[in-house]
Each structure stands twice: as structure tokens, then as C-alpha cells.
């Protein structure tokens, strides 16, 4: 039976290829940091409501004004979180991929500059 669904959800299926990593390594790891701080919904950005979906606050209701708790969660990442992770990866000379929200990077040029220079 031919599946007409356009996405490949099967992959290799039961025919997993034999992978040979350089230097006989047995595992490959990719580190990715999502940088979103400043790109979330916020009335300061002209949004109708503050962020309600992308947070650790489960069941948040839309607020027409500023949601200080939500803003605080996001600000932790730009004020402290990024710098701690960045320092650690720099210290151990580990590569780090950034999945950055354009608006967030535009609002924090110091972090953007540091990412580009690393």
C-alpha cells in the first residue's frame, strides 16, 4: 500500500544503515541553544496579549497588559542564561548551534555580536 502523505515519517525504518564516525567514535552530539528572549508575544511589541504558550507557566491566561512573570522568565535567558551557557561552551571549546529568533537577536545586539564572534 502506497502512503500518499507528503512527509517521510518512516526514515530508514528497519533498515538502519551502519554508521562509521571519524576516529571510531560511537556517538555524535549536537548542542543547540534556542535564543528567543525578546521575540515572545508582549504588549510592548504591539501584540494584543502577552505570551501564553511558550513558557513554563502552564495554563496562563491572556493578559491585555504586561505579564511581568512571563517577561521575567524570558529576561532570565538574555540577562543570565545565555552568558552562563556561552561561557561554558567557550571554556571547553565546544561548538554550539544557535536557533535564534530574528526579533530577539535584533533586540539584544550584544548577544548577537558575541554569537557571531564565537
Regions found by a protein language model. Name each.
Residues 2-118:
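Catalytic alpha-helical scaffold of carbohydrate-active enzymes acting on polysaccharides/glycoconjugates
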Amino acid at each position: 500500500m502506497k502512503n500518499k502523505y507528503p512527509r517521510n515519517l518512516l526514515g530508514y525504518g528497519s533498515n538502519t544503515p551502519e554508521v562509521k564516525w571519524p576516529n571510531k567514535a560511537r556517538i555524535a552530539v549536537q548542542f543547540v541553544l534556542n535564543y528567543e528572549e525578546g521575540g515572545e508575544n508582549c504588549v510592548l511589541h504591539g501584540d494584543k496579549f502577552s505570551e501564553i504558550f511558550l513558557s513554563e507557566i502552564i495554563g496562563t491566561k491572556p493578559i491585555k497588559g504586561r505579564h511581568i512573570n512571563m517577561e521575567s522568565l524570558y529576561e532570565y535567558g538574555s540577562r543570565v542564561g545565555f552568558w552562563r551557557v556561552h561561557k561554558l561552551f567557550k571554556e571547553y571549546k565546544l561548538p554550539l548551534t544557535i536557533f535564534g529568533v530574528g526579533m530577539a537577536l535584533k533586540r539584544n545586539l550584544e548577544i548577537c555580536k558575541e554569537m557571531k564572534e564565537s
